[in-house]
Amino acid sequence: MRTWACLLLLGCGYLAHVLAEEPGIPRDVLDRLARSQIHSIRDLQRLLEIDSVGAEDAPEPSLRAPGVHTARHVAEKPPAPVPVRRKRTIEEAIPAICKTRTVIYEIPRSQVDPTSANFLIWPPCVEVKRCTGCCNTSSVKCQPSRVHHRSVKVAKVEYVRKKPKLKEVQVRLEEHLECACAASSAGPEHREEEAGRRRESGKKRKRKRLRPT
């Protein structure tokens, strides 16, 4: 098991978060780790081109009881049997790969009514698909590569003159369809928001006409 522990330590060294903090690791190795799919220690072994992994057996506990010095003493009082420890099988860690998973999304109050605070939302949270998981190196992050937006109806409950008033409000939800390990940057949803802002600002700005002198 010591050899497996050494292999895990070696793998953790290769999976360091940035090259600047690991000057002894070649950049091409980090790039290869970032692009590769690693599902097990065997995959890591093949990727790092490690030919074989040995196994060392733990030393067996001594069956001789402490305090036994002579055969005569053993004959008079036999030692109690010492239980033999059995090696436990330790399972291999399963990586949480970058993919879509169902997560709980709490509906922001600003999406229902940004001008008021005295109301309730039902349901207060829903299930959506989002990209979660980890990548082989921290230089890349699990990000959505394709998104989808859908609208749902929620109930807005407020009290007017001590009487409950219910109103249905549409809320826009974002679903992640595909994920990828990529460098940290603005995702497709951010690019869409920025494009919308540019369009709005373009409408507000008008070119000034120069009067002839």
Swiss-Prot record:
Residues 181-213 are annotated as: Disordered. Residues 21-89 form a propeptide. It is found in: Secreted. One of its GO terms (biological process) is negative chemotaxis. Residues 1-20 form the signal peptide. Disulfide bonds join 131-179, 135-181. Keywords: Developmental protein, Disulfide bond, Glycoprotein, Growth factor, Mitogen, Secreted, Signal. InterPro entries: Cystine-knot_cytokine, PD_growth_factor_CS, PDGF/VEGF_dom, PDGF_N. Glycans are attached at residue 136. One of its GO terms (cellular component) is membrane. Growth factor that plays an essential role in the regulation of embryonic development, cell proliferation, cell migration, survival and chemotaxis. Potent mitogen for cells of mesenchymal origin. Required for normal lung alveolar septum formation during embryogenesis, normal development of the gastrointestinal tract, normal development of Leydig cells and spermatogenesis. Required for normal oligodendrocyte development and normal myelination in the spinal cord and cerebellum. Plays an important role in wound healing. Signaling is modulated by the formation of heterodimers with PDGFB. Belongs to the PDGF/VEGF growth factor family. PANTHER family: PLATELET-DERIVED GROWTH FACTOR, PLATELET-DERIVED GROWTH FACTOR SUBUNIT A. This is Platelet-derived growth factor subunit A. It comes from Oryctolagus cuniculus.
